[in-house]
Swiss-Prot record:
Compartments it resides in: Nucleus, Nucleolus
Residue intervals of the PINc domain: 65-164
Protein name, entry field: rRNA-processing protein fcf1
Database matches in InterPro entries: Fcf1/Utp23, Fcf1_PIN, PIN-like_dom_sf, PIN_dom
Keyword ATP-binding applies: no
SUPFAM superfamilies: PIN domain-like
Family affiliation: Belongs to the UTP23/FCF1 family. FCF1 subfamily.
Keyword annotations: Nucleus, Ribosome biogenesis, rRNA processing
GO cellular component, as recorded: nucleolus; nucleus; small-subunit processome
Amino acid sequence: MGKAKTTRKFAQVKRVINLKDQRLQKKDQKKEKEKTTKNGELVREIPQMASNLFFQFNESLGPPYHVIIDTNFINFCLQQKIDLFEGLMTCLYAKTIPCISDCVMAELEKLGIRYRIALRIAKDERFERLPCTHKGTYADDCIVQRVMQHKCYLVATNDKNLKQRIRKIPGIPILSVANHKIRVERLVDVVD
């Protein structure tokens, strides 16, 4: 039996909605209403929030943004299949310079073979290496210390403890990976 014959029989057995049915027209009308604004004009573009309002509490932040990257952030980007450089650019709408401290590199090397891809990404030439003068310090302590000294950095991490420590420092934005996207945590409205 040919395909045309079976489709005719299907239409006879099952009730098929006609294309001119009112139920389908109501859905189309709802879609058209969503496209228009209150004034009846078409929405052609959505205004973008000015970046200077977002970073109003920290005047040393500005493009190109220097982003200190933690070990967790690289691993989560790999798990979520996000390109680190493109993700940062699309998130911040500006040129970004990802920075990795020597402590983070040492932490990646200690993790061993399982995290060799993350180590290979961290050794990329596009990353700016931040030399550490201290010896044998925990990577989170190194990041917090560097951010407290120079408030020109954004911090990219998924570590809950590090996020809590950085939230106590006013004016430092935190980037994290969630739902296959890199997101910026909202800055505190009032700085003490």
